[in-house]
């Protein structure tokens, strides 16, 4: 019998209990208001429509059967179309807007019961790693937000590789 040396975990639905609602108008209203600070004046409906159009274009441009979107790249393209020329500024704003998007859409973010107790017990005997079908710009801050940073020797997030698992 082989000795178990490491244990792999998924993130959402295994360790983290999360609920989001990306249909909320507040998301697009908040982003539209934030964009005015950077000289971009759009109504929330325009923000929503453009976000989903760029997402669709991004998916169609990839040849994979299950393409992974890149939320930061969507917002970066959005900002480029709005005339924000500086790549540094676009990158920074894209990350902030992605975080706003997720933060406003999130109804719940919490650990499932006893997650830390179990991880503490397992960490004493095994190497722990995390593999998740997720966006790193959401997953990494959410790992920190619930206090799971420091438990895993390795964290693999699908968005780093541009692939996602089939539904």
Predicted stretch roles:
Residues 41, 85, 125-128, 149:
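A general structural signal for well-ordered secondary-structure junctions
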């Amino acid at each position: 019998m082989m000795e178990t040396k490491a244990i792999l975990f998924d993130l959402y639905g295994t360790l983290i209990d999360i609920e989001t609602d990306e249909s909320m108008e507040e998301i697009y209203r908040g982003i539209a208001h934030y964009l005015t600070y950077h000289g971009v004046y759009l109504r929330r409906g325009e923000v929503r429509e453009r976000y989903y159009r760029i997402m669709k274009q991004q998916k169609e441009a990839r040849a994979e059967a299950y393409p992974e979107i890149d939320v930061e790249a969507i917002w970066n393209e959005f900002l480029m179309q709005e005339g924000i020329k500086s790549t540094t500024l676009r990158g920074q704003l894209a990350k902030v807007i992605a975080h706003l998007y997720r933060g406003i859409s999130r109804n719940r973010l919490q650990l499932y019961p006893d997650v830390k107790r179990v991880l503490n017990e397992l960490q004493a005997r095994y190497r722990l790693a995390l593999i998740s079908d997720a966006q790193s710009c959401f997953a990494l801050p959410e790992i920190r937000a619930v206090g799971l940073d420091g438990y895993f020797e390795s964290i693999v997030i699908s968005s780093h590789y541009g692939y996602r698992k089939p539904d």
